[in-house]
Each structure stands twice: as C-alpha cells, then as structure tokens.
Amino acid sequence: MSSRRVLPTKINLISMRNQLKLIRVIKRLLENKREVLLIYLRTYVNEYEKIYNEVNEALKEVYDSYMKAVVDEGIGNIETIANSQNSSLQLKSSTKVIFGVKIPITELSEASIPPKPFSEVETSPYLSEAYDRMRETMVKVIKLVELESTIRSLVAELRRTQRLINAIDTSILPFYNNSVKYIRSILNDRSREEFVRLKVTRRILQRRRGDGR
C-alpha cells in the first residue's frame, strides 16, 4: 500500500504515530519470543542428540545379546517365544504449551509391559539380557519420538515468528514510516504556505493602513 493513499491530516498523523509505536512493541515481543524459542529448541536438540546416542549404543548391545541367544537357543525357539506374546504396550499422551506451542508428552505405561515369557533358568542368559536391555531402551525410544515431534513443532513456530518479523521489517514498518514522513511533509508544506500567506496578508493590510492616512 502506498503511503500517499493516506489522507494527510493531523489526526491521521497522530494515529499513524501511535500505530507505529504499537508495531514496534509487537516486533520486540516477537523478537523476544524468537529468542526464547531458540533457547528451548537448542535445549531439546541437545537432549535429543544425547538420548539418540544412548539408544544407538543400547540397541547395539541388545542386538549383540540377541544374536548370542539365537546361537544358544536357535532361531526357531526364539521365534516361538516371540510369537507367543500379544501386542500389549500402551502409551499415555498429553500436551503442554510453551509460548503458544503445543508440545506432546508421551509416556509408556509400565503396567502394559508383559513379563518375561520364558524361564531364565531354562533359556540362554543372553535372551534375558536382551529382554531387560530392550525394556529399558523402549522408554528412551518413545522419548526420542516425543522429542522429535517437539522439535518439529518448535521449528514450525520459529519459522512463523520469523515470517511475521520479516513482514514487519519489509512491509509494515516501511509503510507506516513512509506514511508518517509523507503526512508530516505535507503538513509542514501547508504550514509554510500558511505562514507565507499570513505574512503577505499582513503586509497588504499594513500598506492599506499606510495609504489610508
């Protein structure tokens, strides 16, 4: 929108100045929000990387123990034990809000984790070891999924916030600044013209008074 479309009046000048102040306040708030979002984002990314590395190492250990159990028990026996179990894991989901961003919270219900479907005495100790390690790791895997979703939400909100700041910088602020300058320029020109007009009028009146004597 062109600043020249704004009617150059004192009322509009006052209104534009007030709106300009408000826009600058909004921009500062958005910039503060951006900084806070960046802090949260860095925190969650660091946590994600830490847990990811832990899960990666833990899964390697689980796989190593599992393969040793396969050697001891045979793949057929292992598959029979695995197929005897039903899918019973249950997750509890909720959300929390950070600066207007909905953050998912996911927890594994401990009660839904089935007990070991085999006897530790009759089966390979490596199988029991793989089970225990996998049970511990499952909680972290779910935490990773939660963190990934959180990071995506924060990044999306950060991008929206940055777009608003960019719009203010490149479009809104220039329009209001130019409008204020335009109105002020027109009013100043009018004021100068009025001053010159009054000065000329005063001289004419003075001449007339002089001629009337």
From Swiss-Prot:
Function of the protein: Component of the A-type ATP synthase that produces ATP from ADP in the presence of a proton gradient across the membrane.
Protein's UniProt name: A-type ATP synthase subunit D
Q: Which gene encodes it?
A: atpD
Subunit arrangement? Has multiple subunits with at least A(3), B(3), C, D, E, F, H, I and proteolipid K(x).
Which GO terms are recorded in the biological process aspect for this UniProt protein? proton motive force-driven plasma membrane ATP synthesis
PANTHER family, A to Z: V-TYPE ATP SYNTHASE SUBUNIT D
The molecular function terms in GO held by this entry are:
ATP binding; proton-transporting ATP synthase activity, rotational mechanism; proton-transporting ATPase activity, rotational mechanism
Q: Classify the main location.
A: membrane
Xref: InterPro entries: V_ATPase_D (IPR002699)
Q: Provide the topology term for how it sits in the membrane.
A: Peripheral membrane protein
